[in-house]
């Protein structure tokens, strides 16, 4: 499968667009490119705010799933056990709520992704110490809208 086809399949699944020939959407992926663009929400300086936590000590914030994930893209979730190494962390501090995007690959053991997520989302300077649990990762900060608004991960 070519990289372009893989990206299109990922976005069709993430957006809930059925494939070609599926009842209700015979055009398949064409619908993605005709969909209206949703503007990014206004910023409220979310990195200065406290995170909310659920009953299982997971932060309540939006996480974009790594490419190939079957997780829902708009809710917080624990990383599935087969995604146990992180090679890139993208922090979007100007989103409301803040978004931390993890790309997982390899077989290294991931101790606790939520420790790093909380530190990245609420720390004033980027807390590099929290990333030590993740091993060697690339960290990027930007001011672009959330991925669900601008259509995908950054080029590598």
Swiss-Prot record:
Residues 1-16 form the signal peptide. InterPro entries: Herpes_gL_N (IPR007923), Herpes_gL_N_sf (IPR038311), HSV_GL_alphagamma (IPR034708). Residues 50-156 form the gL alphaherpesvirus-type domain. Transmembrane segments: none annotated. Disulfide bonds join 71-95. Keywords: Disulfide bond, Fusion of virus membrane with host cell membrane, Fusion of virus membrane with host membrane, Glycoprotein, Host cell membrane, Host Golgi apparatus, Host membrane, Membrane, Signal, Viral envelope protein, Viral penetration into host cytoplasm, Virion, Virus entry into host cell. It is found in: Virion membrane; Host cell membrane; Host Golgi apparatus, Host trans-Golgi network. It is a peripheral membrane protein. PROSITE patterns: GL_AHV. O-glycosylated, and sialylated. One of its GO terms (biological process) is fusion of virus membrane with host plasma membrane. GO terms for cellular component: host cell Golgi apparatus; host cell plasma membrane; membrane; viral envelope; virion membrane. The heterodimer glycoprotein H-glycoprotein L is required for the fusion of viral and plasma membranes leading to virus entry into the host cell. Acts as a functional inhibitor of gH and maintains gH in an inhibited form. Upon binding to host integrins, gL dissociates from gH leading to activation of the viral fusion glycoproteins gB and gH. Interacts with glycoprotein H (gH); this interaction is necessary for the correct processing and cell surface expression of gH. The heterodimer gH/gL seems to interact with gB trimers during fusion. HAMAP family: HSV_GL_alphagamma. Belongs to the herpesviridae glycoprotein L (gL) family. Alphaherpesvirinae gL subfamily. This is Envelope glycoprotein L. It comes from Suid herpesvirus 1 (strain Indiana-Funkhauser / Becker) (SuHV-1). The lineage of its organism: Viruses, Duplodnaviria, Heunggongvirae, Peploviricota, Herviviricetes.
């Amino acid at each position: 499968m070519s990289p372009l086809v893989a990206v299109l399949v990922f976005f069709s699944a993430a957006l809930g667009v059925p494939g070609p020939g599926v009842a209700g959407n015979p055009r398949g992926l064409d619908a993605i490119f005709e969909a209206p663009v949703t503007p990014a929400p206004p910023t409220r300086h979310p990195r200065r705010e406290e995170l909310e936590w659920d009953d299982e000590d997971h932060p309540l914030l939006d996480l974009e799933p790594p490419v190939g994930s079957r997780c829902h893209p708009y809710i917080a979730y624990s990383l599935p056990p087969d995604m146990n190494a992180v090679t890139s962390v993208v922090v979007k501090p100007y989103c409301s709520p803040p978004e931390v995007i993890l790309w997982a690959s390899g077989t290294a053991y991931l101790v606790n992704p939520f420790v790093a997520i909380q530190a990245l989302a609420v720390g004033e300077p980027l807390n590099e110490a929290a990333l030590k649990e993740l091993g060697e990762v690339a960290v990027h900060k930007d001011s672009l809208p959330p991925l669900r608004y601008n259509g995908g991960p950054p080029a590598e």
